[in-house]
């Protein structure tokens, strides 16, 4: 027996299959683990409501197709609106000067959080924060456009995966200094 659904994590009810309403992908049945070794608190949290919470946010279409939008920890909540960091990163990667991009939440007094983009650009190419913001404004709703752009080498694992947790630390440290 196995069951996969896109559920609202607060109500544990299925989200509408409209291709727009985001929920969390959850599993139950013989396709899940029994729990975390010697960590009952983490097991209890992961299996809230009798379902394994994947941490992946997705939409479901009328035909049942599930499309992953982002990780729950990477969603930016700005003025009550959910912003997918992946959606913003996709737009940034389409800029001809960008070779690597990552977007994380930056604390904001007015909006709660706003997108902050970290970019690596091609050697010898001059691009400004204004250039990047103008590019984003052409492809994204205004509230999704990064308010801050940081240029430089991105921290990566030995396999080349961008370490967003390191970028979140940088943003947190900058926010603490600004206070």
Question: PLM features: what roles do these ranges have?
Answer:
Residues 1-3, 11-23, 32-34, 48-49, ...:
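Conserved ATP-binding loop and adjacent catalytic segment of the adenylate-forming AMP-binding
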Residues 5, 149-152:
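General small-molecule cofactor/ligand-binding pocket signal
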Residues 9-13, 110-111:
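Short, solvent-exposed loop/turn segments that connect beta-strands within catalytic domains
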Residues 130, 134, 174-175, 179:
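N-lobe entry segment of adenylate-forming
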Residues 8-11, 39-42:
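Active-site loops of AMP-binding adenylate-forming
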Residues 37-40, 47:
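Short, flexible helix/strand-to-coil boundary loops that buttress conserved ligand/catalytic motifs
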Residues 4, 23, 29, 34-35, ...:
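AMP-binding/adenylate-forming catalytic core of the ANL superfamily
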